[in-house]
């Protein structure tokens, strides 16, 4: 029995060269150095497959939980501005010694945020986190594997905007979810089209909570990270207090984006 590292389907025919489920080649494909080699085992039981996506602060892979025998998503802390992959193809190393402390702060915040979100397992509208740990000089979060698309992709496929009823349903679900999240003392801090996911069943989920990004920006003069148009004024200064209203501003901007097809005006303007 072997796995397709593209879709994590189990394949009984050891001689198969293509996956009968997704149709992709089972032969190894060359990866960029920033990504883990498919088949890498993390935490002693999670197999990393090919990467699903990457951003300035991390890599996300499809994965397989060998104990529970199910697909998962694996998020790796990887602030690309100042880290790279070691010669072993596993270890994440900081390329500038002057930035090690900043990297470590970001890593610890990444894990703290994972713990906070994992505690929200009973909130349906939040992606479920089942495990998180440090390994290879970095951190990993094991999440439920979601099938569907984020709102950013949906908008691209829908002429850059959606109708009122669809947008209203998504926004109301996000608001209800945030109400429950805020009751637990947790802020999302990164509400935007790419962090709202709609599953194939139509379930709306919040993904990618943004606290760790706030301490891993390259500009050492300010410890903030934001998305222009969605970030309220208090996110532009690390001395300004943030609260539930920070997320609500971003939700309003998101609603505007979905209905008009236009990017919201930056708060500083």
Describe the residue ranges of each PLM region.
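Activation segment signature within eukaryotic-like protein kinase domains
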Residues: 170-171
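Conserved short submotifs of the Hanks-type protein kinase catalytic core
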Residues: 136-150, 154
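Protein kinase catalytic-loop region centered on the HRD/HxD motif
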Residues: 174-186
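AlphaC helix of the eukaryotic protein kinase fold
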Residues: 87-119
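Activation-segment/catalytic-loop signature of the eukaryotic protein kinase fold
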Residues: 131-132
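Conserved end of the kinase activation segment
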Residues: 234-245
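Conserved activation segment of eukaryotic-like protein kinases, specifically the C-terminal portion
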Residues: 221-235
């Amino acid at each position: 029995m072997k796995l397709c590292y593209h879709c994590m389907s189990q394949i009984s025919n050891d001689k198969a060269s293509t996956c009968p489920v997704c149709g992709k080649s089972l032969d190894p494909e060359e990866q960029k150095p920033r990504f883990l080699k498919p088949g890498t085992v993390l935490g002693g039981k999670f197999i990393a497959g090919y990467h699903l996506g990457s951003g300035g602060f991390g890599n996300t892979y499809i994965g397989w939980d060998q104990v529970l025998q199910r697909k998962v998503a694996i998020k790796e802390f990887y602030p690309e501005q100042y880290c790279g992959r070691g010669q072993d193809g596993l270890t994440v190393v900081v390329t500038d010694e002057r930035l090690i402390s900043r990297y470590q702060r970001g890593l610890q915040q990444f894990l703290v945020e994972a713990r906070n979100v994992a505690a929200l397992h009973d909130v349906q509208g939040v992606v479920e986190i089942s495990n998180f740990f440090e390994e290879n000089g970095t951190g990993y979060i094991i999440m439920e594997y979601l099938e569907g698309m984020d709102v950013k992709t949906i908008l691209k496929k829908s002429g850059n905007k959606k109708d009122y009823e669809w947008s209203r349903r998504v926004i109301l679900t996000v608001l209800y979810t945030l109400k429950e999240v805020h009751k637990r003392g947790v802020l999302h801090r990164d509400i935007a089209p790419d962090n709202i996911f709609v599953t194939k069943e139509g379930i709306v989920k919040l993904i990618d909570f943004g606290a760790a990004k706030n301490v891993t920006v390259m500009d050492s003069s300010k410890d903030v990270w934001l998305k222009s148009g969605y970030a309220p004024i208090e996110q532009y200064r690390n001395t300004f207090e943030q609260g539930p209203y920070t997320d609500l501003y971003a939700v309003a901007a998101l609603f505007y984006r979905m209905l008009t097809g236009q990017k919201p005006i930056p708060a500083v303007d």
